[in-house]
């Protein structure tokens, strides 16, 4: 279940608020410029190709490109048996920003976005059918868990703008990781 847990950065051991209602999640994130939505499920085979996935969601992707100016879309997928899963997980576990929006739609599986706003951290467990757009410049990090299992559509205005710029802050190491917040989901 999609879950938003809100932490105070000085009390990272306990969430102040936990929300599972999609409309409430949408409203809380929107207050910080983060777009959250849910798309209808599409029937896709487990081994669907990038082309099949993009075709299944062609209308939604085209709408985002038109409304938000995205130029390209691709599909990223990671499974627990990937030989570089640990390196991929580590790559985005530290707080960073991007010079363009980070947009992900979860075709299957799940992942945990942490969004740092002032003295609060919003931990959003995204699941199948969730769309999130993190505005450029937003301090955040992503945890796919020790046994990743997800497929996402990514949208870009400029893929070079998506390079992570790390903040050097240690806040990500003080918050509960995927293993704690996903609850074995």
UniProtKB/Swiss-Prot annotation:
One of its GO terms (biological process) is L-methionine salvage from S-adenosylmethionine. It comes from the Bacteria. The record marks 104 as: Important to generate the dianion. The record marks 101 as: May play a role in transmitting local conformational changes. Catalyzes 2 different reactions between oxygen and the acireductone 1,2-dihydroxy-3-keto-5-methylthiopentene (DHK-MTPene) depending upon the metal bound in the active site. Fe-containing acireductone dioxygenase (Fe-ARD) produces formate and 2-keto-4-methylthiobutyrate (KMTB), the alpha-ketoacid precursor of methionine in the methionine recycle pathway. Ni-containing acireductone dioxygenase (Ni-ARD) produces methylthiopropionate, carbon monoxide and formate, and does not lie on the methionine recycle pathway. Keywords: Amino-acid biosynthesis, Dioxygenase, Iron, Metal-binding, Methionine biosynthesis, Nickel, Oxidoreductase. Gene3D superfamilies: Jelly Rolls (2.60.120.10). It comes from Marinobacter nauticus (strain ATCC 700491 / DSM 11845 / VT8) (Marinobacter aquaeolei). Its cofactor is Fe(2+); Ni(2+). One of its GO terms (molecular function) is nickel cation binding. Monomer. This is Acireductone dioxygenase. It catalyses: 1,2-dihydroxy-5-(methylsulfanyl)pent-1-en-3-one + O2 = 3-(methylsulfanyl)propanoate + CO + formate + 2 H(+); 1,2-dihydroxy-5-(methylsulfanyl)pent-1-en-3-one + O2 = 4-methylsulfanyl-2-oxobutanoate + formate + 2 H(+).
């Amino acid at each position: 279940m999609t879950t938003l847990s809100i932490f105070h950065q000085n009390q990272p051991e306990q969430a102040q608020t936990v929300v599972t209602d999609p409309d409430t999640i949408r409203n809380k994130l929107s207050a910080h410029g983060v777009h959250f939505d849910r798309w209808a499920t599409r029937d896709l085979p487990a081994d669907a190709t990038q082309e099949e996935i993009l075709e299944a969601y062609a209308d939604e992707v085209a709408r985002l490109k038109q409304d938000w100016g995205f130029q390209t879309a691709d599909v990223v997928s990671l499974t627990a048996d990937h030989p570089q899963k640990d390196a991929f997980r580590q790559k985005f576990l530290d707080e960073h920003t991007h010079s363009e929006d980070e947009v992900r739609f979860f075709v299957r599986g799940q992942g945990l976005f942490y969004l740092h706003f002032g003295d609060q951290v919003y931990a959003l467990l995204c699941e199948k059918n969730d769309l999130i757009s993190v505005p450029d410049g937003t301090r955040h990090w992503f945890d796919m868990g020790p046994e990743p299992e997800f497929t996402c559509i990514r949208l870009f205005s400029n893929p070079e703008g998506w390079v992570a710029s790390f903040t050097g802050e240690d806040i990500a190491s003080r918050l509960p990781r995927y293993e704690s917040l996903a609850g074995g989901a």
